[in-house]
Each structure stands twice: as structure tokens, then as C-alpha cells.
Swiss-Prot record:
Pfam families per record: FtsJ
InterPro entries linked: RNA_methyltr_RlmE (IPR050082), RNA_MeTrfase_FtsJ_dom (IPR002877), rRNA-MeTfrase_E (IPR015507), SAM-dependent_MTases_sf (IPR029063)
Role description: Specifically methylates the uridine in position 2552 of 23S rRNA at the 2'-O position of the ribose in the fully assembled 50S ribosomal subunit.
Family: Belongs to the class I-like SAM-binding methyltransferase superfamily. RNA methyltransferase RlmE family.
A single MF term (Gene Ontology): rRNA (uridine-2'-O-)-methyltransferase activity
Protein name in the entry: Ribosomal RNA large subunit methyltransferase E
Cellular component, GO annotation: cytoplasm
Domain of life: Bacteria
Name of the gene: rlmE
EC number in record: 2.1.1.166
Binding-site residues, S-adenosyl-L-methionine: G60, W62, D80, D96, D122
Taxonomic source organism: Dichelobacter nodosus (strain VCS1703A)
Catalytic activity, as annotated: uridine(2552) in 23S rRNA + S-adenosyl-L-methionine = 2'-O-methyluridine(2552) in 23S rRNA + S-adenosyl-L-homocysteine + H(+)
PANTHER family reported for this sequence: RIBOSOMAL RNA METHYLTRANSFERASE, RRNA METHYLTRANSFERASE 2, MITOCHONDRIAL
Active-site residues from the entry: K162
Length: 210
């Protein structure tokens, strides 16, 4: 089967991408680590002794980076529908985040009555090529991640998620502003310029009295 022009362009860009080359040199699993690294250097969202949950973790670049900062002091819990090779100090769950059994497995690892300090999500759906469908699927995943964050974040905790500009973006932004002290947008240099992706960083979760 002949490659499409877009896939050929992606392969050419990928093999010459400075962040791909840098990830190989520095031993990271993906170029995406530099998106999180830039946000961390600017906003200092990851600190030792934290419990961090990553949604959409495979192939593991973000979890690898977070575990390095925690350095054995704290907990790194990662989840993805795809398999992921084991990483030191990372507890990985393979399963579909949309399924209740998988979500319950995540709750079990966190522990009953326990909260987490940071939720990070780089989840994205498989694309269909139909923009409106892909946007709806993407926003559904983001909303599920936000629901989880609001259920399990400690008061003052932070939530970082990948979002694509389009239908639902403004509503999500406004909703997060009611749940967190501050909501910021971040477009790291490692995010390809033509991509519609951006990151929302919601800081200072406001936990209501239970």
C-alpha cells in the first residue's frame, strides 16, 4: 500500500526532529517528554514526595521523567490502554480508562481515602480523519480525566492535560476555572507548530467540604 503524502511528511519530520534526536541521546522513550520538561521548568508542578497519576502514559516518556524527579520519594502511577515496558519506580496499569473495572483498579492502587497531588494526561483518541468526530472523542477523554482529577486530587493539587482547540475547549476552560485557583495555557516548543494541541494547567484544586 502506498504511503500518503501526510504520513511520508510525518516520517521525514520525525527522523530529523531535534526533539526526537535529543530523546534518543538522553535515553527518553519519546519526544513528548520535552513538552512536560518545559512546563516543569516554568511551573514546577512536580516535586519529591508527591503522588502523581498519569493517564495515557505509553510509551512512558512522561512517567520516566516524573519518576526521575521523584527519585524514589513519592509514587508514580501510570495508566494506558496500550502496553508499556516496565519503568523503575512506576506502577503501570494497562486498560481502558473509560471502563469502570480499570478505573477501580486505579482507585485500589491509590488506596481508599487517599488523594493524589498531581494528575497529568496526554491522552488522545485514535483519529478517524473526521475533524468533528475526532474533536468530540478528544474532549470526552479530557473531560473524563478532569472528572478523575476533581475526584481524587488533594486540596491545592494540580491537573495538566492535553487539549485540542475546537468545540468544547472554551467550556472546559471555564469549568476548570470554577474548580481551581488558576488555569493557564501552555504551548511547549516541542509541540509541533501545525498541531492544534495545547496544554491546560489547572493549579490549586478547590476541594469542597465533604
Amino acid at each position: 500500500m502506498a504511503r500518503s503524502k501526510s504520513s511520508g511528511r510525518w516520517l521525514k519530520e520525525h527522523h530529523s526532529d531535534v526533539f526526537v534526536l535529543k530523546a534518543r541521546e538522553e535515553g527518553f522513550r519519546s519526544r513528548a517528554v520535552y513538552k512536560l520538561k518545559e512546563i516543569q521548568e516554568k511551573d514546577r508542578i512536580i516535586r519529591p514526595n508527591m503522588t502523581v497519576v498519569e493517564l495515557g502514559a505509553a510509551p512512558g516518556g512522561w512517567s520516566q521523567y516524573v519518576a526521575g524527579i521523584l527519585n524514589g520519594r513519592g509514587r508514580m502511577i501510570a495508566l494506558d490502554i496500550l502496553p508499556m515496558d516496565a519503568l523503575p519506580d512506576v506502577h503501570f496499569i494497562q486498560g481502558d480508562f473509560r471502563e469502570e473495572t480499570v478505573l477501580n483498579a486505579l482507585y485500589d492502587i491509590i488506596g481508599e481515602g487517599n488523594y493524589v497531588d498531581l494528575v497529568i494526561s496526554d491522552m488522545a483518541p485514535n483519529t478517524s480523519g473526521i475533524k468533528s468526530v475526532d474533536q468530540a472523542r478528544s474532549m470526552h477523554l479530557v473531560e473524563l480525566a478532569a472528572d478523575f482529577a476533581q475526584e481524587r486530587l488533594v486540596a491545592g493539587g494540580d491537573f495538566l492535560c492535553k487539549v485540542f482547540h475546537g468545540a468544547g475547549f472554551d467550556a472546559l476552560f471555564q469549568h476548570l476555572k470554577t474548580q481551581f485557583s488558576t488555569v493557564l495555557t501552555r504551548k511547549p516548543q516541542a509541540s509541533r507548530a501545525r498541531s492544534q494541541e495545547t496544554y491546560l494547567l489547572a493549579r490549586g484544586f478547590i476541594r469542597s467540604a465533604e
